Every structure is written in structure tokens, then in C-alpha cells.
């Protein structure tokens, strides 16, 4: 609830939706480069490269923030882009795909990483490949949405209006 008014004020919901998808795509690409790849010596001494681990955690934090922001924008966007009689139908579709994405992220991607690890005997490599697959999927969705999601006239930033004041933000909160 606290972040939502800022999303409304700063840019359009379409812009937030696509930009957050781009940010998540970039984060997943960077994750393929930062997943710790300790040397045999580090493995033997049971130490890890903390700087790469820290960067990996930072990228996951950015991804979580982008995902939450995307959710806020997408919730508002479909209400602007669809006629009222189609909104209930879309809620069902969106909920279904949200659940499928959870299963894919928590099940299929983990199974892919596990299968790669079994064949390669390299855990970091298996996760780098899995993050790359995720980055490709997110990038494809972002590219598609950039060109094909509608541009409703009612999707406007409220920056510069009375709704953009700090008082209005806290009143809404």
C-alpha cells in the first residue's frame, strides 16, 4: 500500500509494467555472471567468494522489488485497459497464470537446475544455466509486451496534479 501511490504518480502503469520486466530480465542475466563459482581450493577450505555472494543477494533483492512493483502496476493496468465486463474474466486468467508461474519457478526451474547438476556435477553451472533460461523467458515476455500490450488513454501519470501531493499520498495510505 505504501509504494502504490508512488507508482501512480511517477509514470504510467504500462511504463512500470514493461520497465520492471526489463529490470527483472537484466537482473537474471547478471545473476548468470554472479552466481559464486568457487575454485577447488576454496571448496577444500570451505570458503566462498563473499563479494559475488553479496552481489547475488543484491540482484535477488532488486528482482523482488521489481516483481512487487510490477504486480502493483499490472493490477492497475488491466483495470484501465479492459472494459469493466472483461475485468473479472482477466482476474481469473491472471490468478491462473500467477499460480502456474509459482509452480514453474519453484518446481520446473529447480528440476532443470537439478537435472543439469546431475549431468554436469557442477552446482553453480546448473544455476547459471537455469538463470539464463529464466532471463531468456523474461526477455521474450518483455519484448512481446513492449509491442503488444495496449496503450489506454486513461493510463496517465498523476505527476503535477493535486493527487501527486504528499498529503494525497498519505491520505491514500
Show which residues each predicted segment covers.
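Intracellular loop-helix junctions on the cytosolic face of multi-pass helical membrane proteins
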Residues: 25, 35, 40-57, 69, ...
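Helix-to-loop junctions at the C-terminal end of transmembrane segments
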Residues: 1-12, 113
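Cytoplasmic membrane-interface "Motif A"-like loop-to-helix N-cap segments
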Residues: 8-25
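Intracellular juxtamembrane helix-capping segments at the cytosolic ends
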Residues: 65-82
Amino acid at each position: 500500500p505504501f509504494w502504490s501511490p508512488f507508482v501512480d504518480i511517477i509514470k504510467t502503469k504500462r511504463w512500470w509494467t514493461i520497465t520492471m520486466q526489463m529490470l527483472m530480465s537484466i537482473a537474471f542475466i547478471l545473476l548468470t555472471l554472479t552466481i559464486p563459482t568457487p575454485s577447488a581450493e576454496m571448496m577444500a577450505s570451505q570458503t566462498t567468494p563473499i563479494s559475488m555472494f553479496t552481489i547475488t543477494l543484491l540482484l535477488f533483492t532488486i528482482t523482488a522489488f521489481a516483481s512487487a512493483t510490477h504486480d502493483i502496476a499490472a493490477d492497475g493496468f488491466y483495470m484501465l485497459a479492459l472494459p469493466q465486463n472483461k475485468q473479472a474474466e482477466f482476474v481469473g486468467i491472471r490468478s491462473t497464470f500467477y499460480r502456474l508461474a509459482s509452480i514453474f519457478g519453484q518446481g520446473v526451474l529447480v528440476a532443470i537446475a537439478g537435472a543439469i547438476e546431475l549431468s554436469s556435477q557442477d552446482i553453480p553451472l546448473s544455476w547459471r544455466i537455469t538463470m539464463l533460461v529464466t532471463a531468456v523467458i523474461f526477455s521474450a515476455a518483455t519484448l512481446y509486451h513492449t509491442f503488444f500490450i495496449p496503450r489506454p488513454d486513461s493510463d496517465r501519470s498523476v505527476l503535477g496534479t493535486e493527487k501527486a501531493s504528499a498529503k494525497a499520498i498519505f491520505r491514500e495510505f
